[in-house]
């Protein structure tokens, strides 16, 4: 990866500024030549409103959800955006204050109410946010924006209008679900969320939503729990942002970042707290890796253990001759990385941003190899017999398998994050290339391509330019894994530049193919997808 770049001008602060939605799409100015085969829409979610009246949101994952769309047709591009009409957004706009508690911001009772009304409003129970700012994904013929609670929001991908809120609790037993479901080529959706299992203890359920059937009924109404993972702590589930899926196995990585449910239910209801207040780290747990047989719908009680890390994004998982290969974007240690993503930190001047990031867990791309066939006679031995990996799996005397990873990429305070692959063809299969957003002390300032076999990297980077998660779009006649383009939304506040643009790169070498510039700022976006025409 390229050398570290400095950002003394602080242009990254534009990522965290409130913007207005658009009444109609804008025509973008295209330089270069957009491939004619690239037709469809890039849909992305992120925060677009960072304060309500005089009340600020405090955390990166608090701002109200803004849905973005870049349309591609015959070499032309338009840009549109609208706020998602969630309950959190509509009530905030109506009451001109923050009404529903967000990830790192507490909502307090209406100050206009008398003291008795305000007191009793604390006892209404936990009001969970539906602020769908993290991702968008398809279910059948429909599209849903999501956060990580039990609420998802159905949207119109053409007009960006909000259609309705859906509560997953009405269909399956989960307290929430991740923003990174897996979608198989037939349209089947898998996701994971924590739940109350036997004896009121916490567990993790895998949810399966079938593809659209001939009866055209909403697939969500046919959701089912297919397998359950146990929890290492009876009353403290781990934070889960993604999981691994292959044709035959489901992989769940249980990290030491825990949600204290007693704190969640008591302090929130009684005196006010937010989600961030309810996280804590188990400093002795390390990381537990769990697997389940997907086809037999059975949990496999292999005890995989390793040293502590934070995990938000799986890159890919696949099977290889009796082993599971699990590639992850890790952050070393047990301290919660989100502690460093408060907006006050991210909006600091460059030297302060660097100082804060130096205290945080450090990033590393890792490959773990999980043996599936365990012979107790091999106690004390490395069970991995695959060539071309330095990862190890030692069978310990207590029948646990201690894992040490192969490092695929490591750079001090230089993260390879928000990973993407040629998902449609290579998810759950052996692959070669991953694309990622390069974070420089948490500031996104480059796009990266990683060869996971040779560890070779390619980088796109320009001064005063702050890209988003790269989205890979395969060429319709692709012959190789990386035949296609990479799309990224770039904020460019530097002198002489348009405020933002959609960047199109050749997926082979990250050379620029074209860009589509707009005259308005675009705030940070987290995740999204390319919807082909």
From Swiss-Prot:
UniProt note on tissues of expression: Retinal pigment epithelium specific.
GO biological process: retinal metabolic process; retinoid metabolic process; visual perception; zeaxanthin biosynthetic process
Classification via InterPro entries: Carotenoid_Oase
Highest taxon in the source lineage: Eukaryota
Coiled-coil stretches: none
Cofactor dependency: Fe(2+)
Membrane topology: Lipid-anchor
GO molecular function, one term: all-trans-retinyl-palmitate hydrolase, 11-cis retinol forming activity
Co-factor: note: Binds 1 Fe(2+) ion per subunit.
Chain positions found as Phosphoserine: 117
PTM sites of type N-acetylserine: 2
Positions bound to Fe cation: 180, 241, 313, 527
Entry EC number(s): 3.1.1.64, 5.3.3.22
Keywords, sorted A to Z: Acetylation, Cell membrane, Cytoplasm, Endoplasmic reticulum, Hydrolase, Iron, Isomerase, Lipid metabolism, Lipoprotein, Membrane, Metal-binding, Microsome, Palmitate, Phosphoprotein, Sensory transduction, Vision
GO CC, alphabetical: endoplasmic reticulum membrane; membrane; plasma membrane
Residue numbers of N6-acetyllysine PTMs: 113
Phosphothreonine modified-residue sites: 101, 105
Subcellular location: Cytoplasm; Cell membrane; Microsome membrane
Post-translational modification (record): Palmitoylation by LRAT regulates ligand binding specificity; the palmitoylated form (membrane form) specifically binds all-trans-retinyl-palmitate, while the soluble unpalmitoylated form binds all-trans-retinol (vitamin A).
Substrates-to-products reaction catalysed: an all-trans-retinyl ester + H2O = 11-cis-retinol + a fatty acid + H(+); lutein = (3R,3'S)-zeaxanthin; all-trans-retinyl hexadecanoate + H2O = 11-cis-retinol + hexadecanoate + H(+)
Main location: cytoplasm
Quaternary organization: Interacts with MYO7A; this mediates light-dependent intracellular transport of RPE65.
Family as reported in the entry's similarity comment: Belongs to the carotenoid oxygenase family.
Function: Critical isomerohydrolase in the retinoid cycle involved in regeneration of 11-cis-retinal, the chromophore of rod and cone opsins. Catalyzes the cleavage and isomerization of all-trans-retinyl fatty acid esters to 11-cis-retinol which is further oxidized by 11-cis retinol dehydrogenase to 11-cis-retinal for use as visual chromophore. Essential for the production of 11-cis retinal for both rod and cone photoreceptors. Also capable of catalyzing the isomerization of lutein to meso-zeaxanthin an eye-specific carotenoid.
Protein name per Swiss-Prot or TrEMBL: Retinoid isomerohydrolase
Record organism: Chlorocebus aethiops (Green monkey)
Gene designation: RPE65
């Amino acid at each position: 990866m390229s050398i570290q770049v400095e950002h003394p001008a602080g242009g990254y602060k534009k990522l965290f500024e409130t913007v207005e939605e658009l009444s109609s799409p804008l025509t973008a100015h295209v330089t270069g030549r957009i491939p004619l085969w690239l037709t469809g829409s890039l849909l992305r979610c992120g925060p677009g409103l960072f304060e309500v009246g005089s009340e600020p949101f405090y955390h990166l994952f608090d701002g109200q959800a803004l849905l973005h769309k870049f349309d591609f047709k015959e070499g032309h591009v338009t840009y549109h955006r609208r706020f998602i009409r969630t309950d959190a957004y509509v009530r905030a706009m109506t009451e001109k204050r923050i009404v529903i508690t967000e990830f790192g911001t507490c909502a307090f009772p209406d100050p206009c109410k008398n003291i008795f009304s305000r007191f009793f409003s604390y006892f209404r129970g936990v009001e969970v946010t539906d602020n769908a700012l993290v991702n968008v994904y398809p279910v059948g013929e429909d599209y849903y924006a999501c956060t990580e609670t039990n609420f998802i929001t159905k949207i119109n991908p053409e007009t960006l209008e909000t259609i309705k809120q859906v509560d997953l609790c009405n269909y399956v037993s989960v307290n929430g679900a991740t923003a990174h479901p897996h979608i198989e080529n037939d349209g089947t959706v898998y996701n994971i969320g924590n739940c109350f299992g036997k004896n009121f203890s916490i567990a993790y359920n895998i949810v399966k939503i079938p593809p659209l059937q001939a009866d055209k009924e909403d697939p969500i109404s046919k959701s089912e729990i297919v397998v359950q993972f146990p929890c290492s702590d009876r009353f403290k589930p781990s934070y889960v942002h993604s999981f691994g899926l292959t044709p035959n196995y489901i992989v769940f990585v249980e990290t030491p970042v825990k949600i204290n449910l007693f704190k969640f239910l008591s302090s929130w209801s009684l005196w006010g707290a937010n989600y961030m207040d309810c996280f804590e780290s188990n400093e002795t747990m390390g990381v537990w890796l769990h697997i389940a047989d997907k086809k037999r719908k059975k949990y496999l009680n292999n005890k995989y253990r390793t040293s502590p890390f934070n995990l938000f994004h799986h890159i890919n998982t696949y099977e290889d001759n009796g082993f599971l290969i699990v590639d992850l974007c890790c952050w070393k240690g047990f301290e919660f990385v989100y502690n460093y993503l408060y907006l006050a930190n991210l909006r600091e001047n460059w030297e302060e941003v660097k100082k804060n990031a130096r205290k945080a867990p450090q990033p590393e791309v890792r490959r773990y190899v999980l043996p599936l066939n365990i012979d107790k006679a091999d106690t004390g031995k490395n069970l991995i017999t695959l060539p071309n990996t330095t990862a190890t799996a030692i069978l310990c005397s207590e029948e646990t398998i201690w894992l040490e990873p192969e490092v695929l990429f490591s750079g001090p305070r230089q993260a390879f994050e928000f990973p993407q692959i040629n998902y449609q063809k290579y998810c759950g299969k052996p692959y070669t290339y991953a694309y990622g957003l390069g974070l420089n002390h948490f500031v996104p300032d480059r796009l990266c391509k990683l060869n996971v076999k040779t560890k070779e990297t390619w980088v796109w980077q320009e001064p005063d330019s702050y890209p988003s998660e790269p989205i890979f779009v395969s060429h319709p006649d692709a012959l190789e894994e990386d035949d296609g383009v990479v799309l990224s939304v770039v904020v460019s506040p530097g002198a002489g530049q348009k405020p933002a643009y959609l960047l199109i790169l050749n997926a082979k070498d990250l050379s620029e193919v074209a860009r589509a510039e707009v005259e308005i700022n675009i705030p940070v976006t987290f995740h999204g997808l390319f919807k082909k025409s």
